[in-house]
């Protein structure tokens, strides 16, 4: 699966520069659904779609990767997806995904093991069947979440074209 990211996300432990802090603040503001961050992210993604696909953007479906629960998903992605859909004329797949229950947020889990409390993601199989899908998420570290979600979409008959991320975690070791 092809992937694209706008920024590198560097942990404060490894990079205390003003630039790295600015990226971290942007990512956390986006995760919290802050309007300024949502607007900025949507503008970047709209420009990418328009520059890459032009009038053919309407052939694609943008769907955001599932969050820890439905409340976080809606807060983080609903307005963003609506803005991108309107600005780039891409189809909004978020309206065809439902999240039930809850799992531990992955960015809070040091060992990346998530506890699940009746967590389930339901996809509208009929809607996604035959669609060209691009997945969006805020941060990618290993890519496992995007790959798992891509597999679920493919099981519905979607053709996953790639994934876009605001940032990719940059691992920095001694």
Question: What role is predicted for each listed range?
Answer:
Residues 61, 134, 161-164:
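A structural signal for isolated positions on well-ordered beta-strands in alpha/beta enzyme cores
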Residues 1-61, 98-129, 142, 168-171:
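Active-site-facing substrate-recognition patch
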Residues 84-88, 153:
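Hydrophobic alpha-helical packing residues
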Residues 19, 147-174:
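PRPP-dependent phosphoribosyltransferase catalytic core
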Residues 76-82:
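Charged helix-capping and loop-helix junction motifs
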Residues 66-76:
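Glycine-rich phosphate-binding loops at beta-strand->alpha-helix junctions
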Residues 135-149:
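A phosphate-binding catalytic loop at a beta-strand-loop-alpha-helix junction
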């Amino acid at each position: 699966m092809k992937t694209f990211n706008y920024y590198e996300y560097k942990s404060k432990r490894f990079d205390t520069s003003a630039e790295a802090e600015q990226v971290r603040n942007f990512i956390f503001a986006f995760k919290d659904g802050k309007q300024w961050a949502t607007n900025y992210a949507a503008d970047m993604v709209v420009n990418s779609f328009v520059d890459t696909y032009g009038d053919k953007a309407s052939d694609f479906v943008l769907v955001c990767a599932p969050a820890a629960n439905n409340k976080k998903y809606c807060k983080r992605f609903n307005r963003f997806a609506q803005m991108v859909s309107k600005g780039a004329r891409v189809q909004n797949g978020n309206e065809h995904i439902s999240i039930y229950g809850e799992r531990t947020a992955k960015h809070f889990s040091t060992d990346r093991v998530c506890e699940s409390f009746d967590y389930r993601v339901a996809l509208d199989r009929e809607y996604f069947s035959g669609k060209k899908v691009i997945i969006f998420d805020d941060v990618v570290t290993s890519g496992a979440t995007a790959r798992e979600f891509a597999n679920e979409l493919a099981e519905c008959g979607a053709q996953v074209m790639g994934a876009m991320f605001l940032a990719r975690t940059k691992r920095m070791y001694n």
